[in-house]
Amino acid sequence: MHILKEPDLNDPKLRAKLAKGMGHNYYGEPAWPNDLLYIFPVVILGTIACVVALAVLDPAMLADKADPFATPLEILPEWYLYPVFQILRVVPNKLLGIALQTMIPLGLMLVPFIESFNKFQNPFRRPVAMAVFLFGTAFTIYLGIGAALPIDKSLTLGLF
């Protein structure tokens, strides 16, 4: 049993309407040639003009020249590795530091089992998951800021 009624293409009234162009929507604006020939080049050239203007008017200053004989005081990883670097730097036992980093994904995998919820429920009404997320985000930012500071100020962020 079909729910949708298929059109009868042998019907002369329907054939007459289709012959006049009815059945197709002609509202709106066609992509060809309006978008492809007029709007896209304007956007592309405008973007290139903005980039060139910024490069000419405000050139980015390069860092100091590389000196192979001058080692920096503290070598830092890329910014996205700061929290991991801080954990390894602060924990006295390196095996414990690796174990702590292994426990982070394991703890995140346990969150759905700790809190019973409906999968269609609003995620803002899941207090355990929200608390874990907010604490994890704040702690990651704390570790990232601490990694950029010297080791003696890294835990207190230089506030105490």
From Swiss-Prot:
GO terms for biological process: photosynthetic electron transport chain. SUPFAM superfamilies: a domain/subunit of cytochrome bc1 complex (Ubiquinol-cytochrome c reductase). The keyword Magnesium does not apply. It comes from the Bacteria. The keyword Metal-binding does not apply. GO terms for molecular function: electron transporter, transferring electrons within cytochrome b6/f complex of photosystem II activity; electron transporter, transferring electrons within the cyclic electron transport pathway of photosynthesis activity; ubiquinol-cytochrome-c reductase activity. InterPro entries: Cyt_b/b6_C, Cyt_b/b6_C_sf, Cyt_b6/f_cplx_suIV, Cytochrome_b_C_euk/bac. Keywords: Electron transport, Membrane, Photosynthesis, Thylakoid, Transmembrane, Transmembrane helix, Transport. The chain crosses the membrane at residues 36-56, 95-115, 131-151. One of its GO terms (cellular component) is plasma membrane-derived thylakoid membrane. It is a multi-pass membrane protein. It is found in: Cellular thylakoid membrane. Belongs to the cytochrome b family. PetD subfamily. HAMAP family: Cytb6_f_subIV (MF_01344). The 4 large subunits of the cytochrome b6-f complex are cytochrome b6, subunit IV (17 kDa polypeptide, PetD), cytochrome f and the Rieske protein, while the 4 small subunits are PetG, PetL, PetM and PetN. The complex functions as a dimer. Component of the cytochrome b6-f complex, which mediates electron transfer between photosystem II (PSII) and photosystem I (PSI), cyclic electron flow around PSI, and state transitions. This is Cytochrome b6-f complex subunit 4.
